[in-house]
Amino acid sequence: MRISISSVVSSTTSRFVHRNLQGKGNPRIAPSSIDLCGMCYWGRAFSSGSGDYREILRNGLHSMKLDDAIGLFGGMVKSRPLPSIFEFNKLLSAIAKMKKFDLVISLGEKMQRLGISHNLYTYNILINCFCRRSQISLALALLGKMMKLGYEPSIVTLSSLLNGYCHGKRISDAVALVDQMVEMGYRPDTITFTTLIHGLFLHNKASEAVALVDRMVQRGCQPNLVTYGVVVNGLCKRGDIDLAFNLLNKMEAAKIEANVVIYSTVIDSLCKYRHEDDALNLFTEMENKGVRPNVITYSSLISCLCNYERWSDASRLLSDMIERKINPNVVTFNALIDAFVKEGKLVEAEKLYDEMIKRSIDPDIFTYSSLINGFCMHDRLDEAKHMFELMISKDCFPNVVTYNTLINGFCKAKRIDEGVELFREMSQRGLVGNTVTYTTLIHGFFQARDCDNAQMVFKQMVSDGVHPNIMTYNTLLDGLCKNGKLEKAMVVFEYLQRSKMEPTIYTYNIMIEGMCKAGKVEDGWDLFCSLSLKGVKPDVIIYNTMISGFCRKGLKEEADALFRKMREDGPLPDSGT
């Protein structure tokens, strides 16, 4: 005989259930936001007979739209005699599969008001909906009501609660529930264990999840393909690839054949963790076992191979993919286009873009951004701007990265006005420039020898709450020094030193070079000598800068002495020395 279900819930939850059982009716729920007015029309449509709704329930639920389902319910409640609870359950189940959980709960409440009594299956549907909405307390209250009416919870009921616990950050309750289910005489099935395993991974309890697979087998519950898929996916997300491989071996020993989803998951993980050869070997193994790769398998591998500049392997896979009539998707094309752009092979990238269009594959923001970057890299700014405008015309709106790419292109080409115009347009679209945006504009104004506007952009950046990084400061200091504004650069440098941000070796070189070129070699030498006190080891560039400063000032002995020190300290002189 099974022990009481009350042991399943904590004392706090039990009190909640008890309070909700004091009155009649369902637990209190928020009103549904779904408009049920459509029931009126359907009520009239079904009032003539009962055969119509039965025909739809029998044949038409799999393709039914939400409005039709609402209308069908309206017709059913007005039909006389009333449909059976089994027929209502069939409709509620169909709506639940549409993930309209709040609507199912509202319809269940309406049934109660109309005097249509729920059965165990109805309660299971409603409890599942509460759990899916993360309203576990209401699910438990309904469980209590159901039991008071004499319904014993089934494994389905408890599995729904388990799922609710797992997704409601109550994993300890989920584990306790499974243990108590066993004590109560229930036999957890594969779905129950798989749900708990998924929950354990959600809460970063990978070792417990893997151990549970062995526990399943010990209890005579054989893990299925879905179970193994959940475990493999969880392990791969954590980077535990060796454990994932061990699991593949366990599957093989249990005569459970891994499917394309499981293989693709492991291959993708191998790619992300830079094991491209292992990924290719596993790809070959899956083919040898008769598992046909899909577009996701190919896309992961192609993207990985492109990242490691293995063009011939990537091209071979693309050809193989097309030959097998597996259509590349936007992810596949994006990986290749981005790789070709970074390699400087813009012609090949454009050909792939044309191929996408021929195949009626819509480019996305990554496609356009990669091509815009390619055009900018090759100083084809008008084509980059055209691609940018085409992107917007296709309702694919640029993000901050896209704008930054184009602004940088115009700034490098000394077309700063167009870069500023893009910055304004970006703000009008509600996008906030980031550190890269402002730093790019500062650099662009300095290139145009417009120090005032460069400093204005820096002030606006701070005013807008965008934090400068060391790259921003280096750009500002370099621009001021090269444009003869050493005094202003010194103010910025002193502020930087007082801040929590650490200057880089490049920062010090900028200042030493600026001081030397401004004739303040002694100040440059003082800063150079302070580096060792700051724990900064001078590199060959700083030595060259300081030696050049001494030479420019005619201090040959000091230059020779520093050259000897350079050779003693380790940085090898280069052609600049």
From Swiss-Prot:
Superkingdom of the source species: Eukaryota
Disulfide bonds: none
Keyword Cytoplasm recorded: no
Keywords annotated in UniProt: Repeat
Spans of repeat PPR: 49-83, 84-118, 119-153, 154-188, 189-223, 224-258, 259-293, 294-328, 329-363, 364-398, 399-433, 434-468, 469-503, 504-538, 539-573
Entries under InterPro entries matching the protein: Pentatricopeptide_rpt, TPR-like_helical_dom_sf
PROSITE patterns xref list: PPR
Repeat is among the record's keywords: yes
Entry-linked NCBIfam families: PPR
Similarity annotation: Belongs to the PPR family. P subfamily.
Protein name in the entry: Pentatricopeptide repeat-containing protein At1g63400
